[in-house]
């Protein structure tokens, strides 16, 4: 006769469940990050362009006008 325990060892199942939860959180975090990047790409490009114009254009214009 086989004796069955009333307290089975489910450590392996718990480890798999924890691994699945962790991977699910990583996938969700990646999805939210990507959605945020897509939502702000136009404003980011515009801000970068304006910053480049300020850093390059203003000194160039001052040089052309003879201020520097």
UniProtKB/Swiss-Prot annotation:
Membrane-crossing ranges are: 45-65
InterPro entries, A to Z: MeTrfase_F, MeTrfase_F_su
Gene induction: Part of the probable mtrEDCBAFGH operon.
**Gene Ontology biological-process annotations:** methanogenesis, from carbon dioxide; methylation; one-carbon metabolic process
Q: What does this protein do?
A: Part of a complex that catalyzes the formation of methyl-coenzyme M and tetrahydromethanopterin from coenzyme M and methyl-tetrahydromethanopterin. This is an energy-conserving, sodium-ion translocating step.
Q: Which family does it belong to?
A: Belongs to the MtrF family.
Q: What is this protein called in UniProt?
A: Tetrahydromethanopterin S-methyltransferase subunit F
Q: Which organism is it from?
A: Methanothermobacter marburgensis (strain ATCC BAA-927 / DSM 2133 / JCM 14651 / NBRC 100331 / OCM 82 / Marburg) (Methanobacterium thermoautotrophicum)
Organism phylogeny = Archaea, Methanobacteriati, Methanobacteriota, Methanomada group, Methanobacteria
Gene name as annotated: mtrF
